[in-house]
Amino acid sequence: MVIRSYRAYTLGTRNRSVFEFEKKVRSKPQKKLTFRQHCKKGRNNRGIITSRHRGGGHKRIYRKIDFLRDKKDIFGRIATIEYDPNRNTFICLTYYEDGEKKYILYPQGMRIGDSVVSSTEAPISIGNALPLTNMPLGTAIHNVEITPGKGGQLARAAGAVAKIIAKEGRLATLRLPSGEVRLISQKCLATIGQVGNSDANNRTIGKAGSKRWLGKRPKVRGVVMNPIDHPHGGGEGRAPIGRKKPLTPWGHPALGRKTRRNKKYSDILIVRRRKNN
């Protein structure tokens, strides 16, 4: 995908960049594969804020993505490549031989008219889904299952790719996009290739309004709040936080404390934690 940069006509366009969609990318979705999603604005069923800095944004229609890839041994043809407002990558509308239509994530390099299939004996080509046991070492994959039959949960973001680096017994060793090395059952399904739009991180938002269109509200620093609102608040003028270590708004240690639960079932499956830990 091409990233187009604006000239500094106004303060909002200075250093701002947007994605320039190609002619093959369409945005009108299939009605039967969509449903309206209520914007909860970060509130729970009682109206209490459970996730801060969310609200507003443009209305979206959710596209049902086939993360399961459970159409076994039935070939499909890529009919369209479409824009999805709910994710940074594109999605592909696939026409299967039995007449069913489904959306899948857009693999890098996939073109309109290409065929895909989900099978244990599928060829090693971009867009095909098959178990890890039938993939050679070094294969680039995405949309990886953690539990067999549950659907892909790993490496689904724009530009994400995981690699098979070893196999032993019933488990395969994968290097995930975060740098984490993890063991996964070889019965799990994965899709070959890299997720499209690998330049998503190179876009510059440029102005506050673009963030509001995405449904993201401003983040206020705790040091400029009142003491009743944040442990860092208060003081005369510009003052330090007045603590030995930074705290969250609820008084818990921040910036460096590990938040992963102890004695989690997957601890024995993680060979090496991701880079930022």
From Swiss-Prot:
Annotated localization: Plastid, Chloroplast
Q: Which GO terms describe its biological process?
A: mitochondrial translation
**Pfam families named in the record:** Ribosomal_L2 (PF00181), Ribosomal_L2_C (PF03947)
Q: Which residues form a coiled coil?
A: none
Q: Which domain of life is it from?
A: Eukaryota
Principal cellular location given in the protein's record: plastid
Residue ranges, annotated region (Disordered): 224-257
Sorted keywords for this record are: Chloroplast, Plastid, Ribonucleoprotein, Ribosomal protein
Q: Name one GO cellular component term.
A: chloroplast
Q: Name one GO molecular function term.
A: structural constituent of ribosome
Q: Which family does it belong to?
A: Belongs to the universal ribosomal protein uL2 family.
For this protein, the record's PANTHER family field holds:
LARGE RIBOSOMAL SUBUNIT PROTEIN UL2M, RIBOSOMAL PROTEIN L2
Q: How does it assemble?
A: Part of the 50S ribosomal subunit.
Q: What is this protein called?
A: Large ribosomal subunit protein uL2c
Point out the gene that encodes the protein.
Answer: rpl2
